Amino acid sequence: MQKKYLGRPNYLKQLLAYQDSDLVKIVTGIRRCGKSTLMLLMVEELRKQGISEKNIIHMNMESLQYHELMDYMSFYQHIKEGIQSPGKHYLFFDEIQTVTGWEKAIESLRLDHDVDIYITGSNAYFLSSQLS
């Protein structure tokens, strides 16, 4: 059964305005406020634009399937291996703060590859970190 999501047209419009820019798009908010849903809506929009599934990577870092990627080097290597097809790749990472040193990996991906990066995280982490 396919999941249906409540549309978030205003937030989606804001993300779309920065699509394909060099900026890393960061979506913050309290837990369960719809950050991950917004990412899925953006992925859906990319599919509508004709972006190949091979060029879209979406990972929820709270999932145990990624437990071996909790340091920035293993995370970076995993993503690097996944962006082998030609063209721009769209990277979506939910709860990125669970990866130790994630900032280094994200910056390196941004500098070294043709990518458009979207990340989510909790307000508490981002407001108390060096990013603020």
Where are these regions (language model features)?
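Phosphate-binding site recognition
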Residues: 1-132
